[in-house]
Amino acid sequence: MGDRWSDPLDQWPDPEVYIHYPSGQYLAYMDVRNLNRAFPGRPDGTLTERTTYAFMEFIRREGVDVAIDLQEAELQYPVISTVVTHQKGQEFATMVSMTLTDLEGFKIGTEFSPKNLHGLSHREIGDHSQAVSLLFEAPEPFLDATRGRTSADVLLTGQDEFVVKAGKHGLLFETIDEKGWPIAVRVGRHTSSVAQTIETWTEDHADRAVVARGIPRYADLVRNGVGYYLRDPGKASPSRLAYE
């Protein structure tokens, strides 16, 4: 699992109010360490700002056409099971979401990046580079405030009786039942989303075609599980393993 927060041991202290650069927008104090509130960054800023600036420089210098941010959202969050797109990519993202919904066996919508909400990848990458910026959100009950005990099991199975109960009371923006949202389903949504983004882009931009082979799709992940596509660390040389 990734984490978009900079450690306070590496970036301290937090300000009373976080003032986003370069917009000057006031954000919550803790978002000063939030990677997805610090785009486009600056070379002499905080650790988080320098990190996002490095991403931006890579995108600009390498001439990246499409930047994809893969995220998961709690079911109590309204922006879920969707593609969030910069206005430069509205038609493109809509075609991707329509194709996924029609062919892949899961529904995914389209949301447009708010022009006045700053620091997010889908806003700032599109504003400060040539790239079309997309963000894909998959459902993740592990993140919900109404969940029960936090455990690796909840992370992997996506099952939680308290989140199910919240859904029965109309408190969720995505459906859930006792089957939950297993990690294979969530990963499969993302792999299919990336693959379809590549295919749709290549169909429309033959001169800038992207070639990618062997990407497992949603149905493959649901059928085989995530572990099927990963190397077994138990069989790896100890010199190749890193523990954190």
Can you annotate each of these PLM segments?
Residues 10-20, 103-116, 142-160, 241-244:
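Hydrophobic transmembrane alpha-helix bundles
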Residues 72-142, 147:
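Active-site-proximal helix/loop segments of hydrolytic enzymes
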Residues 117-215:
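Active-site-adjacent mobile loop/cap segments within catalytic or ligand-binding domains
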